[in-house]
Amino acid sequence: MNPSNDHIDISKESTQTNKLHFAARNRIEELRETINYHNRLYYERNSPIITDEAWDALFDELKQLEIKHQEFLTDDSPTQQVGLPPRKPFSVIEHRIPMLSLSNAFDADGIRTWHKKTAELTRRNNFAMVTEPKIDGLAISLIYENGELARASTRGDGTHGEDVTENVRTITSVPKYLAKNSPNTLEVRGEIYMSRDGFDRLNTEIEENNLILQRSGQKAKRLFANPRNAAAGAVRQLDPAVTASRPLAISVYQLAWADETVPSTHWKTLKWL
């Protein structure tokens, strides 16, 4: 055995490890910056420039790198955040229970991993599951007091959301009053969305108005990129009249809390809602 050769081999291995370590840190920083940029476009401006699939790929790559290199994981990483803080034009509402976002499973392996974790958490190998359509819109919290809609807020950063009560009151499909046998106080959560037909009609109206604007030498308005952006932008308008003019609907999928006894399972809750 040649000690000098051993020293050279160890040095080479150490150098290679340092290079990989440095490359991982740089990639993590790059991914965080990129994801934060696209989050601002998505949440604040409602104008994303990449697809949900592309964003998911970036997010998943960052998450895997942080799992592999936990020394680089920090509290301000996008993987540790939910949404963005509320914008200043709206007053802030603190969520009684945090509004969290959903995780994704892209393939059969992802579903099996989720199933295994759920079985471990519940300590049950066999359990019933409820499957629901994922409607892509704006997550909303509705609080009812004495049977009347009292507050509506966005998810925001998961802990604090924007008070959009006046805007949400203009949406015809959002119940303003509940049945007399409802709990005195409760919070439900759901998604405010725009149907594909409504989205197409809205963009057609914008195109027609743009022709008039262009004839008078005024700047044309941008079309909406997708129904999700159109719905989110409509709810977060400073003028409730604009919200009222948009073809919005709501799908309620969760009872967050109530001051009375409520159904014991999610399936029973959905039927009750």
Predicted features and spans:
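RNA/tRNA-interacting regions in translation and RNA-turnover enzymes
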Residues: N2-L273
